Amino acid sequence: MSELSRFFIELGERWQRRWREARVFEPEPAPGVPKYFITAAYPYPNGAIHIGHGRTYLVADVMARFQRHLGRSVLFPMGFHYTGTPILTIAEVIAAGDKAVMEEYMELYGVPEEEIKKMGDPLYLARYFHGQSKRAMERFGLSIDWTREFTTIDPEYQRFIQWQFEKLRKKGLIVRGRHPVGWCPRHSMPVGAHDTKDDKEPDIGQWTLVYFTDSEGLTFPTATLRPETVLGVTNLWINPDAEYVVAEFDGRRAVVSRDAAYRLSFQVGVKILREARGREFVGRMVQNPVTGEWVPVYEARFVDPKVGTGVVMSVPAHAPYDYAALRDLGTVKLIPLIRVEGYGDYPAKEVVERMGIKSQADPALEDATKEVYSAEYARGVMREDVAERVGAHLEEPARSMLRAVFKMYFAGRPVREAREFIARWLTEARLGGVMYDIMNKPVYCRCGTEIVVKVLEDQWFINYGESRWKEAARELVKEMSIVPGEARAQFLATIDWLDKRACARTRGLGTPLPWSSGWVIESLSDSTIYMAFYTVVKRIRQFGIRPEQLTEEFWDFVFLGQGSADEVSKKTGVPVEALKAIREEFEYWYPLDSRNSGKDLIPNHLTFFIFNHVAIFPREKWPRQIVANGWVLREGEKMSKSKRNVLPLDRAVEMYGPDPLRATLALAAEVEQDLDFRDAEARRNAQQLMSIYTLAQRLVQGAEERPPTWVDQWLVAEISRVLERAREAYEKVRVRQAAVEVLYNAKAVFDQYLAMVEKPSRQAVEAAKAWAVAMEPLVPHLAEELWATLGGAGFAALAPWPKLRAEPAALLAKRYVDMLIEDVKNIPAFGQGAKRVVIYVNRSFAWVKAALAGDVKTVIGAGVPPQQAKKVVDLVKTLGDEMRGLIAAVDHFDELEALRSYRNYVEKALGAPVEIYGADDPAAPDLGGKKRVALPLKPGIYVEK
């Protein structure tokens, strides 16, 4: 640990202790005082929280602290998510004596060997990392109200979740039935993102199976995402070297890869009859079930047996990979199916040739495929004549009847409509079927088993596919604030594709499903409205209310205002006063003002949060904002346990100190961007914070009482502008921008000020106090130290947002002086060495005010001598927008007084003595004729070599 780190750690511990002793962050409802309620995703205590968690919590903490400065009563609570399998899986692995995992936990998280052995008990493991994570949050300086802390296996919380689920069930939003889910074969249970390694959400997709059949009745099921192209198939592909099986499923004998048979076995009954290599089936002829055509089976080593069924249909007119492969074989046959504006009859051939693709091994085929598939899906229309390709193998009148159906529902239809029709028709005609798969494979359970898709027959689901529920969720997404704004489209897209989701498991920690024994509510289903629980858990405990008293009537009254306190008290035994107090607490804090989490939770937790709020609560209690931040990299690489580069938050605090760590996480990227945490930047930021501390000491020790000078006024005005920009950044959750303003730009202003004065003034100390408040959301421990050092009363954390006045005249004076210095430096004689500089000031500021209109006649009418009028107008035109705005905001400006006030600064900048005269002073010498050429804001300058 460096001396610098030790300094900031000790500073942090001192102020954290004082906050704790004064209960600074434990708010009570304050009628008449505006509130702000913010939460961030509670962590799973299956390991130590790391700097990725730290970033999410920092953004929430910055927002919470800023809102306190605006005079709001702020609630920022935290709990711990024990539910589900993450904790249980790790405990099982440790209990089994897995040395690799045990060493990983000892190395990454610093777990002592004697402790790791006890972690085979899942509750021991959870409580260990619960405590460690809480300590890390405290040391990090989060302004959390710990009086509302809970875990998701606390009995009070379980009663709350059971109430929520009963509400959903009574609304018809929980159903039991058949549905595909991500599945861990080892544990025989559904899994979601929080059950997988790297929290990867299993993306369940649906293949359409098309049953091609050979002359012996053997079926070759191809798996496709584009069933509308089946009418253009010219051949099938099979990998000659891969392992295949002949198996019975769906009433057929079928050829599929061994891997496909395994995956299908979780969805339909599969009986393997024999094994074979793919080459056994190469050369066979198979019949297209839609057109009746016979097509060959070709070999292709590019076929992946782990994708689909391992049997692929080839459509060279509309699939670049197929076209390139058949061109290599010299057997291209093209059948046009889809018209797309901007393309000819054979889009695949056209794009392959345009891109100059020479072989099937060319990586550019990926881009070609994306282009063709995207264009055909977005703008493609099935050709009118495709129906004539249907049913050539059928006898009349069956052939004509089938073609009539295809003419009506397929030919001339947009691709997306044709796709839906033929997929449904193939299944209903038993000429095809459905196969589910993990489209973002491989996805692994935390136990290490690869996830598959299982079709569950008797599972409990939350039906996120219910249309009216979806519409209510869309309403909330459209009206709430979402940071970043571009994430709104992702929420709407997630709402569109969400369907039934398994909500209960048969193993793991959590809340029992209230109406069906043996089921435990899973982790992404018991974490959707827990923000409401924060508002009441403290009172429930204070009043000593037992879990069995937390009935449906209790929650209905507290959260929905249903029933009377007297009635509920009689049914539950909870005192009327307690019921009213708890109800009032909820009413004060809800709705939630901001929900903060990582962007990876948009496709699951955050969208479920939206759905469940609109289902349970009235509109006035719907959440107001979501903030979804980007990921955290470390030294340019994704953090992962396998790379051993995960940086636990507690260790990071130990390495850098809390404020340097906070500053680095704030400065590295804006909220929506991924953040690359670098050691060198953290150490540079620590030096910057120390220089701020040193500067404050210098201000206090050297400050003197004096009438404010132009330089003092400039400091106050400039800091006022910095703080205004910082406030705007905080309000927009532009955390990096706010950090740049208060930690770097404000420091630069103070540095410049101290370089211009011999001694700082009391006004400078007051400006520094304002600065301390503005930096408090980001680096609260340093801010408290500065606040106390500078004479601030109470805590900086509770100080109102500072109000400094930016006097335009003070800003104008500094800009004017800097312009003058630049003008002097641009004089050739100055560059040859100056003995002294003589400046003549024209004090006719009214001329410049008149010239803002830009009209010479107006300027002359204002009393400006005609020979000077055009010069003044031309001068004003050369000034920038900022300077012109300052001139417009100032009624009177004495250039001579301002310049004399800045004399020391000017002399330091020029490195030469400076003499200053009024151009209207008859006693002033006119050196080089410069006295008479002086204009307002454009002094006459004489350089003596």
Swiss-Prot record:
GO BP, sorted A to Z: leucyl-tRNA aminoacylation
Gene3D superfamilies for this protein: Class I aminoacyl-tRNA synthetases (RS) (3.30.2320.20), HUPs (3.40.50.620), Isoleucyl-tRNA Synthetase, Domain 1 (1.10.730.10), leucyl-tRNA synthetase (1.10.10.720), Valyl/Leucyl/Isoleucyl-tRNA synthetase, editing domain (3.90.740.10)
Any Pfam family the entry gives: tRNA-synt_1
The entry's keywords: Aminoacyl-tRNA synthetase, ATP-binding, Cytoplasm, Ligase, Nucleotide-binding, Protein biosynthesis
Alphabetical list of SUPFAM superfamilies matching this protein: Anticodon-binding domain of a subclass of class I aminoacyl-tRNA synthetases, Nucleotidylyl transferase, ValRS/IleRS/LeuRS editing domain
Catalytic reactions on record: tRNA(Leu) + L-leucine + ATP = L-leucyl-tRNA(Leu) + AMP + diphosphate
Domain of life of the native organism: Archaea
Main location: cytoplasm
Similarity remark: Belongs to the class-I aminoacyl-tRNA synthetase family.
PANTHER family (UniProt xref): LEUCINE--TRNA LIGASE, CYTOPLASMIC, LEUCYL-TRNA SYNTHETASE
HAMAP family referenced in this protein's UniProt entry, alphabetically: Leu_tRNA_synth_A
Protein name: Leucine--tRNA ligase
Organism: Pyrobaculum neutrophilum (strain DSM 2338 / JCM 9278 / NBRC 100436 / V24Sta) (Thermoproteus neutrophilus)
Gene: leuS
